[in-house]
Amino acid sequence: FLNNFHDIFTTIGVVILFAGLSLGGAQFHESLRLEAGSLSSHAAAITLLALIGLMAWGLSALLVGRQRRILPGIVLCCVFVVFASLALSWIYIRLIMAQFDSAAFDAAVDSITSTSALSREAFDAMLADLPWTIRLMPIVFGGSALVVSAFYYSSFRLPFAGGLTGLALVSFAMLAWLVIDPYTVVRFNPLINLLMGLALFLGGIAFDARDPARTTRLSGTGFWLHFFAAPMLLSAAVTLAITGAQADGESPLGTGPVFMPMTEDGYALRAAIVSLVVIAVFALISLLINRRALIVSGLLTTGVALAVLVNQLGLDGAGVAAVTLLVLGGIVVLLGVAWTPVRGVLTAPFPSSGVIARIIPPVAHGHEG
């Protein structure tokens, strides 16, 4: 991420610059005093979004394309993808506004909210009330993000942009599925998230296998694919283990394992134990494939699970926080110190060459992921 402290200095400048551009653009649009909802107002907003995106692209050509500065490139990539995809999506929104029937949309929403339980019939009724121009909006939003992120990655080969493109790709697939069969996506959301996470994880493995020594941009892209895959896999695995494949909207855990303290004590304790078991499996996989991203993404959930367990000791809030941080910090430091020796033990039974060695690289390669 860093070549030297100059990268941090430049990144701070980039963040300040685009924060100012965003606020300035909003103020400029307001100063035009255009009629709200008019074509000229929409055109001005789209133009301002596109201009900020183009500025991010221009700086990327200098900082990423020529100077290969990774950390500023991550910020610029995010700015470009957000503003460019918003501009593209806004164009579609403006085109369909003339066909938008608010009464039909309200009726479609009411057909879902008026039912006490999710059913395929309710979703079918909702779809029947919505025109295709509205139903396709998720695909347009997801497709815009995918096209923009893929364009950035193909232009600058920034590893972060590659990971973001992978995330946009699986998100686009999920949104397309949502348009075709919303009931299945909503009802079986934990299973869908697991499939998305597995797709990103396998993509990361594919990039890693092409660079087992972890020395090129390929492994950098693999890192970010693992980084984006890990939260999906962890949340989906914990939710599946506790609530099953179907989404449970009434349980706070249905939103994610980090909300386990909001559940009943017995349920929270069970969720904490399951979470730690899943995280332990993730840690084992991380050691085998030499990727810390799977562990890093689970630190928050690990901390929450440990806090739930420590809370059983009857300590006050400060005591729970102190013990949790001590245990969590100790685990991270221990993994950092013993990473290579433990990997040496775990990878010893595996071959040191061939296809398996590209997926589970031996310690002899020396580089850490």
Predicted regions and their residues:
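Alpha-helical multi-pass membrane segments and their bilayer interfacial helix-loop junctions
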Residues: 1-369
